[in-house]
């Protein structure tokens, strides 16, 4: 809730709001190839990530009712059970590896930011996807992506899930 009592429903609206409060401008430029990558990720990424969300002992899933609600909503949306999606991991993991190879070519070597210069909307869009993908056992990040995701994790103090990947 904002000071005026209004609410923000979209996470990107929240990001923009905090940047305005800090009097700094977020570079909102997103290269078309990064936008396309994010959109393609949604096709297979959710099928890898969502079944694992509830298996990682995340605080938001501490209550069984939270797990049941999330599972019911997401299975209906994905039109597949989490069990079925976990069995299809090899198929979606192959798509993930190909997408990561593409993304690797869009990130400069040793870059701490997707655009290679500074924090931007590209990071706001890409980092959460890569962080969530780290919960998938067997995912292998190519060099540029691996450097980026670790650098962003450290800078943001947001841990990755490699140590408990499923």
Question: Which sequence ranges carry the predicted segments?
Answer:
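Alpha-helical oligomerization segments
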Residues: 139, 147-166
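A general structural signal marking secondary-structure boundaries and capping sites
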Residues: 22, 107-110, 156
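GST-like fold's C-terminal all-alpha helical module
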Residues: 43-151
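Aromatic-enriched hydrophobic runs in primary sequence
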Residues: 1, 33-34, 90, 112, ...
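GST-like domain detector, emphasizing the conserved glutathione-binding G-site
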Residues: 1-72
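Small-side-chain structural scaffolding
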Residues: 11, 122, 161-162
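Short, hydrophobic secondary-structure boundary micro-motifs
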Residues: 26-29, 113-116, 160-164
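Non-transmembrane alpha-helical segments in soluble domains
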Residues: 12-15, 19, 35-38, 97-100, ...
